[in-house]
Amino acid sequence: MTNKIIIPTTGDKITFIDGKLSVPNNPIIPYIEGDGIGVDVTPPMLKVVNAAVAKAYGGDRKIEWLEVYAGEKATKMYDSETWLPEETLNILQEYKVSIKGPLTTPVGGGMSSLNVAIRQMLDLYVCQRPVQWFTGVPSPVKRPSEVDMVIFRENTEDIYAGIEYKAGSDKAKSVIKFLIEEMGASNIRFTENCGIGIKPVSKEGSQRLVRQAIQYAIDNNKDSVTLVHKGNIMKFTEGAFKDWGYELAIEEFGASLLHGGPWCSLKNPNTGKEIIIKDVIADAMLQQVLLRPAEYSVIATLNLNGDYLSDALAAQVGGIGIAPGANLGDEVAVFEATHGTAPKYAGKNKVNPGSVILSAEMMLRHMGWLEADLLLKGMSGAIQAKTVTYDFERLMDDATLVSCSAFGDCIIDHM
């Protein structure tokens, strides 16, 4: 395959030394523009980040952007069958920190999702989704300000592993036959036309996710970590996730049982504050985040539950149009727009770029460039001034409608 990616002649790589990121003053950061509305939201993101870094650091720090390709743009740059070039994956791995727009799902065989493929191929096992409300953002709930949570969603296992077989296929029939004849399964109905999926959940995968969630709670002085699961039904996968989570809290963080367990607590070694480790059944949690959101701060959960919870919570604070996200491994991090490609709006300079801009703010914090929280100040100022894109303008009184790119400019003006 011909190399298509052009490395900047200036700038240095972010490296990982002794367990920590080492970020130069002029880091090279790869980005994927994205499909559909990626062409609309990514350019304002780059402009806003550059402005925030310049305002925070003058000329002392600067990002050197490196475009890499995935999705539809990759099929045009390479060939029609290449949706996720090996060259792109290698650079995301090598340069440690990157950001991407939304990617479409290829039609037909092969990978089921480019987003999932990137997470699995780079072992980005944490999907981190902070959910908080900006003053002035239209919300369907009465007290959106009570929503302030960070979701840690396991990113590589569960049914998203993609191990499933089409109804009526030879593979599905073989699996069904094995389950019935070898494993004694007796409750598979309609065996001739039954799709089959596998739900892998490992102790190692569960505990490394919970470890990151508890460490985040310690580092950010949070009150609790909630293990969300459906263990009352799926005892050996979802239930095991819960049990392994408690086990890790006790064995690695020194947590003590509360009232005989399974809830437990540990003392924050930095502040002395008590952190409660608790669990909630997934369907009950979907009620709790509506009725009692203030009782939850850090959530650790498996892949599917995390998908549901992330979008449900985002709806309470303005929708996924401004919901940021990060995919994190032990060394590599890929930040992303959490919404889809919305092809009917592509190229119309209309949609809200907030998701990928706020993901960029997460990226800067991950790099240790904390002064660049000017992004948050700018976003909040633009929203409170009611100079907003159509998704907010239609729900606000006396708001001024602006384009996608103009909203980015408004964020810069309010830094």
Curated annotation (Swiss-Prot):
NADP(+) binds at residues 104, 339-345, 352, 390, 394. Induction: Expression increases when acetate is the sole source of carbon and energy. It is an enzyme of class 1 (oxidoreductase). InterPro entries: IsoCit/isopropylmalate_DH_CS, Isocitrate_DH_NADP_dimer_prok, IsoPropMal-DH-like_dom. Its EC number is 1.1.1.42. It catalyses: D-threo-isocitrate + NADP(+) = 2-oxoglutarate + CO2 + NADPH. Its cofactor is Mg(2+); Mn(2+). Homodimer. This is Isocitrate dehydrogenase [NADP] 1. It comes from Colwellia maris. The gene is icdI.
